[in-house]
């Protein structure tokens, strides 16, 4: 069967937004207007089709990006729902990798909020063209033009309104289309699909003219031809304006802005028209970079012909079909029942069934074509971020980077009988989510789970109960401390054992140097004249790496250290890899004790939005938690406080903040960097660890 939608008419888009901007409602309406779901799901009553996991329904927040296919004006739109909560930034990163364009939804009252900044940064990182939809225009305090200012000032974007609102709050009637210069009005609330084109209301004519001129100016800057025409005083045609907007959108030099209220069904159809008109088809975005095993780079172009190449970007467990692996096909096509080659793992995989997801319904398909997104059933070894390719062309597409977790808790099943069920559940969840890790504490034998924040781990424990029926007891949250050194030292260490028969001999001189934060570990071999034979150098490196696992102060992993082996000696008979590994390991530990070792802790970027009267209390409390306040702003009549706070002091913050501000303040928090722990705190940590 050949493809039904040509590549040119495919759009892979994500809806990205802050937690309450109305992203799920917007996705819902898109599905409704494109005819996929008949009754509109409301987040308010917890029945949205996009939010298909139980907890999302309860918390009213979107956690997993379900990929949904729908159709609008002969175009296939693959909608990837992205979560809007900071603990799930990894999900957002992951979906940004496979999207070609995004719709950024902002609340007309809240405007640009902390999570929007994070999502915007990630979209910039992956070069994702976007259009803005200012939602909730019917709410009290709605202000489209404020949001435009904030996108300019806070996000440093170049917003270009293609519409301006007619009225706001209760009087929001529709929008003025600045391209056709017509008013689009939704008159009958009971028939959300119908809107009428009218003349622009007299009182808005001047504003519409002013914004049309701004739009035309922005469009004329996208090409020399349009600029000449514009400067020569000629009118640009509607087609030229649209082509200019698309060019500006794709080059990221402008962000087209639209508005509406998804909840009241106003403004969604023009948004869909804009997705089709201005966001890129898979063959209009930059080629994706790939490499072969030997490191040669290659550029993979999105085409139907050519060897198959796809990226697995999400794994989910579905109660009916088992494990689903969501893939984005970049080149060629994939048939159900065929084989594909996992070039990241170097393994052959059999492709079972292929599914296309329509929010929570699934359709079985025979083939997945270039540019499309679907789910594969039956893959054994493929994890998030792996490449599936053809055996003839084993390309590895760009790998995704996943952050290290910053918080851990110990979990134990309520009953001993559940121990095995719990391990199975945790391993399945870890397969789905690369920012979540499971390990065993060697001393206590407890199972430790680690993730990106308190909410992240709460949801994992919750999913164990719901999906795998395992009840777990959760310990106190533990912070992922690290250690590093502050001084350069040189250390000699000789490991020599003589105990009948063959001895052990390894002798090294190591130089330990501190590195910039975030550099990790660097090993340098500076041995001259073979004083340590080449074959023992990897053992020295390995010995140092083993010592890095447990720092000298409190046994935390050591990072940001450069270790150079620059001298040493060996024994013809007694030297061995083992001896050099031990010499390096012990030498590093001795050196680290003299190198001014310090403990580092994760610092979180905290943003609190509070009514002015509680500002003093909030700041006082952040200072008590060893926080450093960086800035204070105003937004929508509230004060915004940004601070860096140690994660160790932030447990249970939401409850404290609620009681300080009578529940009127909100906050968001994400990991930012590691910083040195003050001496008094460091002493306490060491005392606790070394008991």
Curated annotation (Swiss-Prot):
Extract the InterPro entries matched here: EF-G-like_DII (IPR053905), EFG_II (IPR041095), EFG_III (IPR009022), EFG_III/V (IPR035647), EFG_IV (IPR047872), EFG_V (IPR035649), EFG_V-like (IPR000640), G_TR_CS (IPR031157)
**CDD domains with a match to the protein in the record:** EF-G (cd01886), EFG_III (cd16262), EFG_mtEFG1_IV (cd01434), EFG_mtEFG_C (cd03713), EFG_mtEFG_II (cd04088)
What GO terms fall under cellular component here? cytoplasm
Q: Where in the cell is it found?
A: Cytoplasm
Q: Which GO terms describe its molecular function?
A: GTP binding; GTPase activity; translation elongation factor activity
Can you tell me where the transmembrane regions are?
none
Q: List keywords of the entry alphabetically.
A: Cytoplasm, Elongation factor, GTP-binding, Nucleotide-binding, Protein biosynthesis
The record ties this protein, via SUPFAM superfamilies, to: EF-G C-terminal domain-like, P-loop containing nucleoside triphosphate hydrolases, Ribosomal protein S5 domain 2-like, Translation proteins
Q: Which Pfam families match?
A: EF-G_D2 (PF22042), EFG_C (PF00679), EFG_III (PF14492), EFG_IV (PF03764), GTP_EFTU (PF00009)
tr-type G domain residues are: 8-283
Top-level division of the source organism's lineage: Bacteria
> Which HAMAP family has this protein been placed in?
EF_G_EF_2_B
Give the family this protein belongs to, as stated in its UniProt record.
Answer: Belongs to the TRAFAC class translation factor GTPase superfamily. Classic translation factor GTPase family. EF-G/EF-2 subfamily.
Q: What is this protein called?
A: Elongation factor G
Q: Which organism is it from?
A: Campylobacter lari (strain RM2100 / D67 / ATCC BAA-1060)
Underlying gene? fusA
